[in-house]
């Protein structure tokens, strides 16, 4: 045990070891509170005094939630050597987190965003104080759990740090080689002397490698044999990186370098976040310091990412989930454009559904006022055009080969890889199930909305039939009036045109039978048991009641337990006979559980999901055809309504001229009677006939007017027929 005046620690209670110091878990003598105690070794005292004091001076300047806090600088009781009393971080480092098999292929998106936020926050504080860290890596980013239960990451180990302004440079070498800037790598690792000096932006390269590692679980630049076994190829990769690339991997000995500007398929970050993150990585993983972003642009771009809100969207036809990263002050027009970037559905073709209702977003509506969404309750988007089903894009990862040879080191590495693969399969199975559940929900809602559209079309057709019937009756009565006018030798040039309209209206009336037949066909397809009922969605695929994810989790727990035991066995370096036999039995169990898990994943999860996806694509294609057919029928009804309305307007104009024609008819009779000198009987007959004609015409005019009034009232009752089941925001 060692101690200072206020703290004590056990030499066996070590938290970490470095080149110049060890860190122990210590306690305050009076309170018992835990602290991290950094004790410097003999090698550290070989450094110049100013270098030894540099870490103390740097830490004294820093005070930020994302920097490990320095509480005191004390002296060890016996040696009188300086020790640092620092904030204790019980959850280890980011490296510890990435070593967990569950993070073998990168952190979950929510955790990665916390890492991004906290590292950027800590880096910004360093820059505000003119400090360059020079050894940023996952092992120097500590983790604690905050009061809200979320992780908080803090930069630590400022042994390599020094004060440096943006326009200053340095020549001394520090850092960990996998995370080193290429210029520093050349001199520090390859031992090649050059006259280059290094600026503060060398930290940005290390940050870029760290972020890529956190996002994917792997280093971005990897020679075939590994970064530390083939340093020349490593240097070739980091200096030869094309502009825009964020990774370079050599997959075979002496093979070519595979460059990529995208995250690997196994990365769990969403497409929306990757689109924002990859340009940042591409511009800070830049060997040429002239081309590399400066701190100002780095902080501006990362701050832009961190200040966005997320809107969850599910593309029904693609069968894909999306996260739309958007500023709260952006409008719906921007949202539609961002949806297009991820789904390739143009804004004019995007139909939105939220909680079973159509969602219409006013183009000026701010994103902060959109409905609240989650992964399980997103906004659904469908297209008015045919789209191919995509489904979940994921890496098809196989189990590593399990060698029968007894090897503690090899077995621990193998067990870690196996556990990582099964973790990935378990996570993928959960996502596949979520996609199927969202499809079931979306299909059910889409069927209901199409039924609403069908009812609207039936409603419109009924309205058109009634209107058409009234109009035909009006025209027929108008024809009678004009025929009576013809009897008294009055000119009625409109009669021929009215007869043509009557013929056209009868033709339109006869077309209603075809529309009715098509509507009945659509109704039968949408009805329970019909071709487009949603019963298939409940029959195909996997369901929560199958508990496939839970079954995989049970196997994963067994595998993880064996992995942790193998880690302990590796630390022992050599096992007694009985422990060795148990180790061999566990290795057999590991193989059994892993193969069973992957077989279950393949047969029960993937195969059934693929069948569900194929059925979904077929159903969506048929549904789109039905919707287009229904839209065509609706348009036909509107076209007929428009044509009937035009004829009705013409009929109304004729009705307005009838009183004048009736007066003309009366005058025409008197004028015709004067020169003929008819007998008194003939005159009486003609007068009575005209009175009767006038009464009939007045009756027709009155009836026509009443019909028009009924039509107007009917129209006002149906004007809002198309606005049901719609949320307008």
Curated annotation (Swiss-Prot):
GO MF, one term, reads: identical protein binding
Keyword Kinase listed: yes
| Domain spans labelled Ubiquitin-like | 309-385
Query: How is the enzymatic or functional activity of this protein modulated?
Result: Kinase activity is inhibited competitively by amlexanox.
Entry comment on modification after translation: Autophosphorylation at Ser-172 activates the kinase, and is an essential step for virus-triggered signaling. Phosphorylated by IKBKB/IKKB at Ser-172. Phosphorylation requires homodimerization and ubiquitination at Lys-30 and Lys-401. Dephosphorylated at Ser-172 by PPM1B and this negatively regulates its role in mediating antiviral response. 'Lys-63'-linked polyubiquitination by MIB1 after RNA virus infection, or by NRDP1 after LPS stimulation at Lys-30 and Lys-401, participates in kinase activation. 'Lys-48'-linked polyubiquitination at Lys-670 by DTX4 leads to proteasomal degradation. 'Lys-48'-linked polyubiquitination by TRAIP also leads to proteasomal degradation. 'Lys-48'-linked polyubiquitination by TRAF7; leading to proteasomal degradation. 'Lys-63'-linked polyubiquitination by RNF128 at Lys-30 and Lys-401 leads to the activation of antiviral responses.
Q: Which positions are tagged coiled coil?
A: 407-657, 658-713
User: Domain of life here?
Assistant: Eukaryota
Q: Can you locate the Glycyl lysine isopeptide (Lys-Gly) (interchain with G-Cter in ubiquitin) cross-link?
A: 30, 401, 670
Q: Which residues form the Protein kinase domain?
A: 9-310
Residues the record lists as Phosphoserine modifications: 172, 716
Q: Recorded E.C. number(s)?
A: 2.7.11.1
Q: Which residues form the active site?
A: 135 (proton acceptor)
Domain writeup? Comprises A N-terminal kinase domain, a ubiquitin-like domain and a C-terminal coiled-coil region mediating homodimerization.
> What job does the chain carry out?
Serine/threonine kinase that plays an essential role in regulating inflammatory responses to foreign agents. Following activation of toll-like receptors by viral or bacterial components, associates with TRAF3 and TANK and phosphorylates interferon regulatory factors (IRFs) IRF3 and IRF7 as well as DDX3X. This activity allows subsequent homodimerization and nuclear translocation of the IRFs leading to transcriptional activation of pro-inflammatory and antiviral genes including IFNA and IFNB.
Q: What protein am I looking at?
A: Serine/threonine-protein kinase TBK1
User: What's the source species' lineage?
Assistant: Eukaryota, Metazoa, Chordata, Craniata, Vertebrata
